[in-house]
Amino acid sequence: MDLLTIAKHVADRVEVESARQKVPVAVTVIDIHGNVVLTHRATGAPAFSLELAERKAYTSALVGMRTADLVPLVQPGAALYPLLAVSGGRYSAIGGGVPLTSDGQVIAGVGVSGGTTEQDVAIVEAAVINPDPPGPTGPSAARVPVGYTEQKARVGDVVINYVRGGNGPTLVLLHGYPETWYEWRELLPEFGKQYTVIAPDLRGAGASDAPADGYDKKTMAADIHGLLTQLGLADGIRLVGHDIGTMVAYAYAAAHPSEVTRLVLSESPLPDEGLYQFPSLTSKGPGFWNFGFFSNINGLPEDIITGQEDIWVARFIDTLEVHKDAIGPAQVREYASHLHDPAHLRAGFEWFRAFPKDMKDNAEYIKTRLPMPVLAIGAQGSLGDLVPNQIRRYATDMTGIVIEDCGHWIYQEQPQQILERLRQFLR
């Protein structure tokens, strides 16, 4: 098991223990080379807690000891006093940091901060030193649902990560920004009862490669088609897209109309001249400000977000939610963990920077309207009927719906309503 996966399991256990004690905390995992593997601050944890958790994790990783045990060793004249004196403030002798070991060797340090020292120590030690064995319903056991496996395949010049499970006709699920295949995690068990499900990480997302280019939706759709062709599943697919995944799904269906039996396009406009009509500010508050912000090519988005990935993902998701906390801390950590890699952080913005190329491609695609049945979905608290109104021009057989009492994240905010709608349409 790789260190990032282990770190996510530890963070899940910290979340469970902090919830049990009703103490919101920050948790950081740092490897023995001083690199941040994962960092997350729960809602309600003090602003300073993230920095202190990092110091505790750094200290435990490099010293190989509990920070609570360091107090007598860092007093003036003691063995480790010079360590604190020259550390520039990065070391900490406050309880709440513990080393993470594998086969008796220290592989990382874990730091927790947000409560009293005693609470921080209790939470981190319950999570790392004496964790409850993960059961079939425990938070550490179910990142990939039962009946599914996570795999990789080389497709042309990229490696595509994907989750596969279930049995039946092929159902392909394409996620949006800043998500990964994990967007569909809660729905996968139900989908798997009727379909062979393929949920990939798009080029530049999750555990898929993040190359320098290829983020136009025509190329990203070709990645998915190549994957399905390798798997022998390209014929007669049902295809569902959300957000950026909607743009990729459309490009896929337009390029291979005879291979797609049903198409779902949800909560995203398709790149065409209509994009310029979306305001960044509305009478109800912020509009599509992110389209312009992400499209900056001078590195501004990357520079602002680097080092704040967890906060960025949590707050960005929150701005588009009607049902707050529909996407929880574990999901935020999952998405943010991949953005710590500069190539993946940049790739997410390249999806938006490619819109001019997408517009040119779609101007050709729209000359032949989609022949398959298309379900176009908007959310009442987000795009509403803008989605079906636009898709009507692209398809010959379109059904449009608006999910009530819902924000942009329709698959997490109204999962049961969405499941029923998709069951009716996809069958």
Where are these regions (language model features)?
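Flexible, solvent-exposed loop/hinge segments and secondary-structure transition points
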Residues: 1-136
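Hydrophobic residues on the short alpha-helix immediately C-terminal to a glycine-rich phosphate/catalytic loop
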Residues: 127, 187, 252, 421-425
